[in-house]
């Protein structure tokens, strides 16, 4: 079953990538950012700390939305069991790899809560040469749209994909499909490991429901001010068909 996109308020469209090594650092960032961020993505580094679900619980108690970004990829039964358990937690988004239709169908069937499942299409750190090295000699946008349509057909609620592909995905899948875009660079490309990046306004105008921002906030001289500036961009770029 495809769940409709989350009814996000404008300030919830900014998701901060909480890429830190442990619970104390995570909560320090939440306190530092305060009201400027209402949605947090927690990923593999926190999982390795052994404090992952303590952080998830702490975020929920602070009335923050949570995006579990662990990119599950295993046999269908294993992924289904994981999603079934995770859907009992206060999680808004969760990622699964979008490479296997049977696994996606099992994950969708196992989702028993309000959590939205997002299929990983092509990582934003990858370009065409990277795909070619994997035996996929095609443009990233073509692979992304193909996987988005396959995920939608399998009952997955949306995708996580570069903002460069938000428009083609939205045109292919229609309005009732979630698109979350990482690799957002408010000030333009900065020469890091992200290859397929766009700005805030472009991602939202092209159909993104939410954007993920990490280093542009984390490395700023004033992270809360940087997040507030992005929130101002979001408010100025509200897309009518999503509100």
Curated annotation (Swiss-Prot):
Record: residues binding substrate: 19, 41, 69-78, 124, 185, 194, 214-215
Pathway: Pyrimidine metabolism; UMP biosynthesis via de novo pathway; UMP from orotate: step 2/2
Keyword Heme in annotation: no
Enzyme's top EC category: lyase
Subunit details: Homodimer.
Summary of the function given for this chain in its UniProt record: Catalyzes the decarboxylation of orotidine 5'-monophosphate (OMP) to uridine 5'-monophosphate (UMP).
Name recorded for this polypeptide: Orotidine 5'-phosphate decarboxylase
Species this protein is from: Xanthomonas campestris pv. campestris (strain B100)
